[in-house]
From Swiss-Prot:
Signal peptide residues on this chain, from the entry's feature table: 1-21
Keyword flag Cell inner membrane: no
Quaternary structure note: Self-assembles to form functional amyloid fibrils called rodlets. Self-assembly into fibrillar rodlets occurs spontaneously at hydrophobic:hydrophilic interfaces and the rodlets further associate laterally to form amphipathic monolayers.
Function description: Aerial growth, conidiation, and dispersal of filamentous fungi in the environment rely upon a capability of their secreting small amphipathic proteins called hydrophobins (HPBs) with low sequence identity. Class I can self-assemble into an outermost layer of rodlet bundles on aerial cell surfaces, conferring cellular hydrophobicity that supports fungal growth, development and dispersal; whereas Class II form highly ordered films at water-air interfaces through intermolecular interactions but contribute nothing to the rodlet structure.
Intrachain disulfide bonds: 50-113, 57-107, 58-97, 114-127
Glycosites: 131
Name of the protein described by the UniProt record: Class I hydrophobin 15
Molecular function terms, GO-annotated: structural constituent of cell wall
Organism of origin: Pleurotus ostreatus (strain PC15)
Domain of life: Eukaryota
CDD domains membership: hydrophobin_I
GO cellular component terms, A-Z: extracellular region; fungal-type cell wall
Family designation: Belongs to the fungal hydrophobin family.
Length: 135
């Protein structure tokens, strides 16, 4: 039990450092904005479609080769929290993603359709950006 608690503490400490390293920008005009959780974002799906899963609201979208993104993914894989995310991973990674309910929530950041969400949005793999105004 102690080992699991220590692992979680290390990952949370890494996330805190990761959050401080992410640049801030206007999420409506840029794919890079504030910090947080991670989701893989693939090339854009047809506008308005979300057949892959729930729509996510991500505060930032960064390329998987960015050192801080890659280090976070490697750390999660190293501690056995995720498996197989790094090998062959290409594309963008969304930062701080949470489910978006079309009925009432609004997203002032980057919206994306995601099919595999891990750790309550910490990592969501298989995402595509989506324009909700056209849904």
């Amino acid at each position: 039990m102690f080992a699991k608690s220590a692992t979680i503490a290390i990952v949370l400490a890494a996330l805190a450092g990761f959050s401080a390293a992410v640049p801030t920008a206007d999420c409506r005009t840029s794919k890079t904005c504030s910090s947080g959780k991670v989701a893989l974002v693939a090339p854009a799906a047809p506008v308005g479609s979300c057949s892959t899963g729930k729509v996510q609201c991500c505060n930032s979208v960064e390329h998987s080769t960015q050192p801080h993104v890659n280090n976070l993914l490697l750390g999660l894989e190293h501690f056995g929290l995720v498996k197989g995310l790094i090998g062959g991973l290409t594309g963008n990674v969304g930062i701080q993603c949470s489910p978006l309910l079309l009925s009432g929530n609004s997203c002032t950041a980057q919206t994306a359709c995601c099919e595999n969400v891990h750790f309550n949005g910490l990592i969501a793999v298989g995402c595509s950006p989506v324009n909700l105004s056209l849904l």
